[in-house]
Amino acid sequence: MKDYNRISLRTQALFDLTHTLARPWLEHTEYPWEILSDIPAVIREIGATLPTDLYDHPAEDIWIAKSATVAPTAFVGAPAIIGENTEVRHGAFIRGSALVGDGCVVGNSTELKNCILFDGTQVPHYNYVGDSVLGYKSHMGAGAITSNVKSDKSPVVVKPASGFEGDFDPIPTGRKKFGAMLGDFAEVGCNSVLNPGTIVGPHTNVYPLSSVRGAVPAGAIFKSGKGSEIVGKE
């Protein structure tokens, strides 16, 4: 699969930055995980500039679009921004440090922590998203989660996914907490686990019940079985 290299992992290759309020900060990163430590500060800085005719400010460091729907049983912790026309459903748990874009769905029993959801992202059923960036119109099926800490607590290193040899050396991130980066339009099947440091390229499909570790290229299909397999869509 061509063009599967370090360049394909860069922020500009994974995301259309016009679909997030974090664009000015992401534009200054080479790789998107570089923003993870700054998410709380980014949210506070953006929040202070949001127009009061479009956003409510119900508590310190929390901004919720007037057009958004937040169920009474959902919890939104600071700092957080909930974008326009976004739906936060019953039982959702936004722990804090969550920048949720426009037109998103955060569903029942979904937990968000230190993450950016681009516009149109859906995490609608029993998802955990921690220390992650989810691109425009990406979607996680029911029960799909990001695992953000390695069992031995060692720093995360980004590598090619099992089953495919990418044209790049392992990239140390220096982070002990790092979930996943989902490119625009990425689809993650039900009950899949995205292990620490997973990168899913734009327009890539991850089959249900997959255990993904490493970087999966754009426009691919990832399957788990006796071993992992990556195949082209055509």
Language model region names:
Residues 72-106, 148-149, 156-168, 172, ...:
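Short secondary-structure boundary segments
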Residues 30-34, 117-119, 184:
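Short, solvent-exposed linear motifs at loop/edge-of-secondary-structure regions
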